[in-house]
């Protein structure tokens, strides 16, 4: 069974409904040339519209990222790829999402815990540190030495405006070298494999944030 099937079957087992990949060229969205993430076709539902397939969704979305053209030739970026994703539209939130991701990686794929590290939103003057995610990772045996607190890389928004929120990124140690006891943001042997975004806010053109009507989860893997 390939990775896509394992992923979809796992999340179906957790009550998610598989939705189809949207067209690469967005429909009714002129903000981008191509769909760049699995959440992009779901923006209306992340802003509060009711999705016809329910509150737990999963898929693999075809994506094109022109911003990654400068990265062609490295070992971690693709211009075209299929992003695996799962969403909660006002249903589960941070703790459940992190548990689902952790269990898929360690129990379904069999990745050793010591090969995983994470980053968590450290907070700023407007939005507090994400202590819920930090403490959840600790409870799952990720030691504090492999939990990095950052700002810019751990607050996610698709563009200048729209649904957004803190995120927690998961990294895999891909080298055959001895696994370090701590995570170094500048060590490229650690590669990001999954991002869990906790969409709590909508950013407006004037730079202000308002609470979304529902707290949503948007994850992207790949």
Task: Please give the residue ranges for each predicted region.
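Alpha-helical segments
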Residues: 1-221
């Amino acid at each position: 069974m390939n990775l896509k099937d394992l992923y979809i079957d796992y999340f179906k087992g957790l009550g998610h409904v598989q939705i189809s990949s949207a067209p690469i060229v967005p429909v009714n969205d002129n903000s981008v040339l191509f769909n760049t993430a699995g959440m992009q076709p779901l923006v209306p539902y992340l802003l509060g519209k009711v999705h016809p397939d329910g509150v737990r969704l999963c898929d693999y979305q075809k994506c094109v990222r022109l911003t990654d053209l400068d990265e062609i030739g490295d070992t971690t970026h693709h211009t075209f790829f299929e992003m695996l994703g799962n969403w909660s539209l006002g249903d589960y939130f941070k703790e459940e999402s992190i548990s689902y991701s952790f269990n898929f990686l360690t129990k379904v794929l069999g990745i050793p815990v010591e090969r995983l590290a994470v980053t968590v939103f450290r907070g700023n003057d407007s939005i507090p540190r994400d202590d819920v995610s930090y403490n959840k990772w600790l409870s799952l045996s990720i030691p504090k030495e492999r939990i990095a607190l950052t700002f810019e890389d751990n607050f996610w928004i698709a563009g200048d405006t729209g649904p957004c929120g803190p995120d927690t990124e998961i990294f895999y140690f891909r080298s055959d070298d001895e696994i370090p006891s701590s995570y170094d943001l500048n060590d490229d042997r650690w590669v990001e494999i999954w991002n869990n975004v906790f969409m709590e806010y909508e950013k407006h053109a004037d730079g202000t944030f308002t609470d979304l009507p529902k707290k949503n989860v948007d994850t992207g893997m790949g």
